[in-house]
Swiss-Prot record:
Main localization category: plastid
Transmembrane feature ranges: none
Expression sites by tissue: Expressed in roots and shoots. Expressed at low levels in cauline leaves, flower buds, flowers and siliques.
PANTHER family: DNA REPAIR RAD52-LIKE PROTEIN 2, CHLOROPLASTIC (PTHR34050:SF3)
Natural source organism: Arabidopsis thaliana (Mouse-ear cress)
Disulfide bonds: none
Name recorded for this polypeptide: DNA repair RAD52-like protein 2, chloroplastic
Lineage: Eukaryota, Viridiplantae, Streptophyta, Embryophyta, Tracheophyta
Gene Ontology cellular-component annotations: chloroplast; plastid
Function: Involved in double-stranded DNA break repair.
Disrupted gene: phenotype observed: Reduced fertility, increased sensitivity to mitomycin C, and decreased levels of intrachromosomal recombination.
The gene coding this protein: RAD52-2
Keyword Chloroplast belongs to the record: yes
Family: Belongs to the RAD52 family.
Residues bearing the modification N-acetylserine: S41
Feature: transit peptide: 1-40
């Protein structure tokens, strides 16, 4: 699932614990990281190692966590956001298809988690939603996804679909896998990695 996740740090004061050991462990004014947001899972669209954890390669973008967490801080116009989304993606981010694709439509793809982070960097305040999930009689599942980007001068949205077969043994969760595809295609409709579909 590819939705924005935010993290914040908050200070909590704790009333007097009953034991000295508890006072040491839970000292007042200790900073505790609090995660809030939507659970994101990466179903496994590209191969049989969906259960393996993979390291995320270093990249040349950093997602600001606290600065842009509220939608009131958006000051960039849509034209600037779209210009930045159309920039070339660093080569260490672009992945090749594990089983090489039979169609020459795409030379590579951006994993959903990198697309998520890049959207959070270039278009803070973006919003994504699953509009429809369609189960076909032939064993396919299709997800319709809408991506909305907000700027200082308005908002724009793009919709796209992702389809996978439910009989593929390499895919643990077909709905999540279809959502990942639909999300990345919606990002491409805004220009993020669009050139990968033309090479």
């Amino acid at each position: 699932m590819a939705l924005q996740v935010q993290q914040t740090s908050a200070a909590f004061t704790i009333s007097s614990p009953s034991t000295a050991a508890a006072r040491i462990k839970l000292s007042p004014f200790r900073t505790v990281a609090v995660n809030r947001g939507v659970r994101c899972s990466g179903g496994g669209v590209g191969g049989g190692d969906a259960g393996k954890k993979k390291a995320v390669p270093n990249s040349n973008y950093v997602v600001p966590i606290d600065k842009f967490s509220s939608s009131s801080s958006i000051t960039r116009p849509l034209i600037e956001i779209l210009r930045d989304l159309n920039k070339k993606i660093p080569d260490n981010i672009v992945k090749s298809h594990d089983p090489p694709s039979t169609s020459a439509a795409t030379s590579g793809f951006i994993p959903w988690y990198h697309a998520n982070r890049m959207l959070s960097f270039y278009a803070p305040g973006w919003c994504g939603e699953v509009r429809d999930v369609i189960f076909s009689e032939n064993g396919n599942v299709t997800v319709v996804y809408r991506l909305t980007i907000r700027g200082s001068d308005g908002e724009a949205h793009r919709e796209s679909t992702g389809t996978v077969t439910t009989t593929d043994d390499h895919i643990e969760d077909p709905v999540t896998a279809a959502e990942e595809i639909a999300f990345c295609r919606a990002c491409a409709r805004f220009g993020l990695g669009l050139y990968l579909y033309h090479e």
